Amino acid sequence: MSTQSGIVAEQALLHSLNENLSADGIVIIIAKISPDSTSVHQTQVARSFEELVQLASQEREPLYIFYKPEGLDKYFFVSFIPDGSPVRSRMLYASTKNTLARQVGSNSLSTEQPLITDAQDLVDLKNFDSARPAGQNKPLTHDEEMQIEINKQQALLRKNTSVKLVSQDSASPLSLTFRVNSEKPINEILDSEGKNLIIFQIDPSNETIQIVQSDTCPSVDELYIDLPGPSYTIFRQGDSSFFIYSCPSGSKVKDRMIYASNKNGFINYLKNDQKIAFSKVVEIGDFVELDKSLLMATNKEDSLDHGSNPDLPNKSNLKFNKPKGPLRKRRT
């Protein structure tokens, strides 16, 4: 799964950062992702922490903050992720941060990049100055840095969300960060209404997992999923239930991240809260990649609920799109 959003900094922001690098006194440059999610633009240049706190207190969306202390020619690159900010925005900012840092350049940034969630805590940035020692850790690769950043955001989500799918006193990464929105218990739809096919999609605008289709599918051969974007599907065949995670080619990066980070939590919700035991968990790209033989009734030895862990993907079930080679020009 890609961990980059494709969003880049506007030239005006990069020019401002470069120009203010040699300025006297402290400089605080505030930036955010544009409403159309295509670029990062500068919103304000603050000259005091009081001004910074006032501006940040009015924001519900995350911010990027570049703080240059007096007497230092480097910025501290701060991620401000306010409590209560939308999940989609948090993930988008996490996946854009490293791209933005590369554009600004390592020569202009300190090795310390604080993550702050409360506007009042921004005043603590005054403790970051030229006297602070540089980090002694071995430099991380880009993928390692990106994964750490995403893990930070997911940890924040688990801390702030009221929905838990595992033990309430456990810090398990298998927690659900979205609320499941269903008028009836899902197991009741399967057991009482006779439906054996339920398809779910995530609505980031209100942070819920919703049922978009519930049907009776006579056989595996007639199973078909045709949705514009990722989805979770429960399919019941006889006494066996299957969970299908589909992420079609062309899905947006931010959607891929949201669905991937909530998959295990949703499976645990279905298992623990709805008492649905899955024989297999299948992950596919486009629906045409689904090997329907995987959805045949399985015996106890094959069932994931008898000795295997459904939270870990079965490698034999994973299928990926084969990259297409370049098209050759037809000779005439």
From Swiss-Prot:
Region (Disordered): 301-332
Bias (Basic residues) ranges: 321-332
Main location as per UniProt: cytoplasm
Lineage: superkingdom: Eukaryota
Domain ADF-H as annotated: residue spans: 5-132, 173-300
SMART domains: ADF
Keyword Membrane appears in the UniProt entry: no
Family: Belongs to the actin-binding proteins ADF family. Twinfilin subfamily.
Function noted in UniProt: Actin-binding protein involved in motile and morphological processes. Inhibits actin polymerization, likely by sequestering G-actin. Prevents actin filament assembly by forming a 1:1 complex with actin monomers, and inhibits the nucleotide exchange reaction of actin monomers.
SUBUNIT field: Interacts with G-actin; ADP-actin form.
Protein's recorded name: Twinfilin-1
